[in-house]
Amino acid sequence: CNPTTVLDYRKLLLEVDGVRNAWLEPVGTNGPPHLYLPPESTGPELQCWPEDGSVSRPNPVVLNGLYSVLIQKETGEDDKKVFMSVRERLAAHRNLCEDFKAITILCPLEIGVCADVEIDVGADAAAVYEAIIRALRSYIAPELKYYTLKELLDKGRAIEDVFAGRPFLRSRSVGFVDTKELEALHLRDELFGSDLYSAVLGVGGVVAIRSICFQTSVSPGGDTIQRVRVLPGFVAEFSLDRTCVQLQTTRGVLSLDKERIHRRLQEGTKPKRGLEHLDLPVPTGRYLP
């Protein structure tokens, strides 16, 4: 079956190799209309909205069912390959009176965090450091979790909600996503330093934060950044290379094997599960002689 809602389309696109996340935006609802009917036109000829202001009295037109598609790709994936795969998948499942104005592969904005954190004297420094990095990554670039059918049912999700809007695939799949978790993953345009404080202070063993700020690929050297704006066409991605978290106690600065911890924190690829993990078993029945 074809998608019927924006969330359904997002679930469909998550099955495409190389796609980490996807968003659909109705054209014309957020900002000025992109189509207009020329004043001199005598027929139903729509044109794109001119950016140079050459049209003085355009007649704006908003079409239902016209979307812009925004794609966050997996690290290292080829833009053109992902674009072609997304376009092919959308074309195969497009409904009548629906179309896609543009498919945009978002550029990654690498964001790290520099912090000086005090922890308890008796705390496991390596475990606290790993938990801090995970908390920072979860705030800057939260990841979707994929489930088997059993895992979602164990979370208390009703089976009709689990399968609602999920694409029917005949082979392997990445699994299920929790609809509530998917809805919560918005394409954000701002990140705030105050949220970094909340994320780190929520880690067990942390006593205080002496300093914390963002470090981005576009930030001037030496600046203390407490707010990051993510421009249109970009998506925030957490960068370990731009992150420097120093731990200390009342006894002094702690030394850690950070490279070893970083290897454990490397992002994995999306899972590929067989259909036996994505459906209920068929009852075997009883043999009656």
PLM regions: where:
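Solvent-exposed, conformationally flexible loop/turn segments
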Residues: 223-251, 259
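Short coil/loop linkers at secondary-structure junctions
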Residues: 19-20, 206-207, 231
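Carbohydrate-recognition loop of C-type lectin domains
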Residues: 2-180, 245-289
